[in-house]
C-alpha cells in the first residue's frame, strides 16, 4: 500500500519537516522553544484577527473600541488578555531561544542565524506598533518618543519622521498606518519562519554537545512531537494563568488613561521585553549615539559567528566561556531593571556601566576566553 504522506506533494513536505525528520537523539528541552514560538505566533495571529474585527483605528474611538471589546464582545476580555500576554510569552520564548543559540553555538549555522535576527527585528517592530493601537497615554508618548529617534539621522531625519507620522505629530494617520502594518507583519513573520526552517533543515539541528550528530538520529515523530506537546502544555498553562488571574501585571498603569497630547507621562517606558534596549538607548547622552547603540545592541548578534574562534562549538565543556555567558544574562537582567527606573542617579551610572559591559562581554571578553580555552586544550 502506498503511504500517502510520503508520496503526496504537499504531505511530503510536512512529512520531511515534522514527521520523518532525522533529529539528534540528545537534544534537550532548550530545543523546545522553536516550536513554542510557532505556537505563540499562531495564537497571536488568531487572537489578533478577532480583535481586528472589533477594533477601530481612529484616534477619537480607538481607546473606546478596546473598552468595548473587553465589555461587550463575547469573551472579548479573554481574547484581548491572551493577545497582550501572548506577546510577553512570545518574547520570553524568543529570548530563551536566542540564549540557547548562543550557549550551544547554533549561530554557526549562519543562514539560519541571520534569518533569525531578521525575524527578531520584525517581531520587535510588530510589537512596537501593536503597543500604539490601544491609544492609551503610554501608547501615544511611546510612539512619539520612539519614532522621534529617527530625527537623529543626519539630513533626512526630520523629513523621515514626518513621513512616518503622516503629519506634524502622532495622529490619526499614524494610528491607521500602524494598524495596517501591525496586521500584515505577522504574516511576513510566518513566511520568514518557513525560510528559517528551510535553512535549518538543510543542515539539521545542532545538539548540546556541539558535535556531528549524524551517527545517532531518531525520527521527529513521535519522540519530539510528544516532547513539544509537553512544552506547549506548560506554555498554555502559564499564558492562561497570567491572562485569567493577573492580566494587567505586565501592563503600564498609564495606558488605562486615554491618550492626551497635552498631558505628558512622567516616566515613558516600553513593555518589559524592550527595557534592556531602552536602557542602552538612554545610557548615551547623545541622541544619534543612543540610536546607534540601540541598533548595535540587536545587530551585534549578526557578528557572533565571526567572533567564534573556539575549537569547540558548544559552551558545555568551556567553564570560562560559560561564566561569561551567565554574566551576559545577568547584565541583560540588570539593564531590564534599569530601563524601568526613572532617569536619575544612581540608575544613570549603573545603566552606562552595564551598557559598556554588554558590548565588552560580546566583542572582547568572549573571543579572548575562546582563545584562552583553545590554548588550554593543547597537551
Curated annotation (Swiss-Prot):
Binding site for heme b b562: 83, 182
TM annotation in the entry: 33-53, 77-98, 113-133, 178-198, 226-246, 288-308, 320-340, 347-367
Amino acids binding heme b b566: 97, 196
Cofactor: heme b
Example of a GO cellular component annotation carried by this entry: respiratory chain complex III
The entry's keywords: Electron transport, Heme, Iron, Membrane, Metal-binding, Mitochondrion, Mitochondrion inner membrane, Respiratory chain, Transmembrane, Transmembrane helix, Transport, Ubiquinone
Subunit structure: The cytochrome bc1 complex contains 11 subunits: 3 respiratory subunits (MT-CYB, CYC1 and UQCRFS1), 2 core proteins (UQCRC1 and UQCRC2) and 6 low-molecular weight proteins (UQCRH/QCR6, UQCRB/QCR7, UQCRQ/QCR8, UQCR10/QCR9, UQCR11/QCR10 and a cleavage product of UQCRFS1). This cytochrome bc1 complex then forms a dimer.
Functional summary from the UniProt entry: Component of the ubiquinol-cytochrome c reductase complex (complex III or cytochrome b-c1 complex) that is part of the mitochondrial respiratory chain. The b-c1 complex mediates electron transfer from ubiquinol to cytochrome c. Contributes to the generation of a proton gradient across the mitochondrial membrane that is then used for ATP synthesis.
The protein, known as: Cytochrome b
Lineage: Eukaryota, Metazoa, Chordata, Craniata, Vertebrata
Amino acid at each position: 500500500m502506498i503511504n500517502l504522506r510520503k508520496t503526496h506533494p504537499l504531505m511530503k513536505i510536512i512529512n520531511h519537516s515534522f514527521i520523518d525528520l532525522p533529529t539528534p537523539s540528545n537534544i534537550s528541552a532548550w530545543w523546545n522553544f522553536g516550536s513554542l514560538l510557532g505556537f505563540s505566533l499562531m495564537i497571536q495571529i488568531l487572537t489578533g484577527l478577532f480583535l481586528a474585527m472589533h477594533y477601530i483605528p481612529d484616534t477619537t474611538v480607538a481607546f473606546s473600541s478596546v473598552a468595548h471589546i473587553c465589555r461587550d464582545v463575547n469573551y472579548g476580555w479573554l481574547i484581548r488578555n491572551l493577545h497582550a500576554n501572548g506577546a510577553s510569552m512570545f518574547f520570553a520564548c524568543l529570548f530563551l531561544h536566542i540564549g540557547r543559540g548562543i550557549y550551544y553555538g547554533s549561530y554557526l549555522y549562519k543562514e539560519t542565524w541571520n534569518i533569525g535576527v531578521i525575524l527578531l527585528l520584525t517581531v520587535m517592530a510588530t510589537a512596537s506598533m501593536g503597543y500604539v493601537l490601544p491609544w492609551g497615554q503610554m501608547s501615544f508618548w511611546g510612539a512619539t518618543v520612539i519614532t522621534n529617534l529617527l530625527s537623529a539621522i543626519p539630513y533626512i531625519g526630520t523629513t523621515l519622521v514626518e513621513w512616518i507620522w503622516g503629519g506634524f505629530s502622532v495622529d490619526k494617520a499614524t494610528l491607521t498606518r500602524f494598524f495596517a502594518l501591525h496586521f500584515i507583519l505577522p504574516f511576513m513573520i510566518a513566511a520568514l519562519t518557513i525560510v528559517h526552517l528551510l535553512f535549518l533543515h538543510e543542515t539539521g539541528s545542532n545538539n548540546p554537545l556541539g558535535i556531528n550528530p549524524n551517527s545517532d538520529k531518531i525520527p521527529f515523530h513521535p519522540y519530539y512531537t510528544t516532547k513539544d506537546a509537553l512544552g506547549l502544555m506548560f506554555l498554555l498553562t502559564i499564558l492562561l494563568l497570567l491572562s485569567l488571574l493577573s492580566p494587567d501585571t505586565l501592563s503600564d498603569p498609564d495606558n488605562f488613561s486615554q491618550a492626551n497630547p497635552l498631558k505628558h507621562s512622567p516616566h515613558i517606558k516600553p513593555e518589559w521585553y524592550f527595557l534592556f534596549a531602552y536602557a542602552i538607548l538612554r545610557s548615551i547622552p547623545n541622541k544619534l549615539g543612543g540610536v546607534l547603540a540601540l541598533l548595535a545592541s540587536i545587530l551585534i548578534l549578526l557578528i557572533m559567528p565571526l567572533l567564534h574562534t573556539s575549537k569547540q562549538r558548544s559552551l558545555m565543556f568551556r567553564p570560562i566561556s560559560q561564566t561569561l555567558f551567565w554574566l551576559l544574562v545577568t547584565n541583560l537582567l540588570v539593564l531590564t531593571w534599569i530601563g524601568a527606573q526613572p532617569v536619575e542617579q544612581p540608575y544613570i551610572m549603573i545603566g552606562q556601566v552595564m551598557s559598556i559591559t554588554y558590548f565588552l562581554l560580546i566583542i572582547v571578553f568572549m573571543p579572548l576566553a575562546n582563545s584562552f580555552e583553545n590554548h588550554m586544550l593543547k597537551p
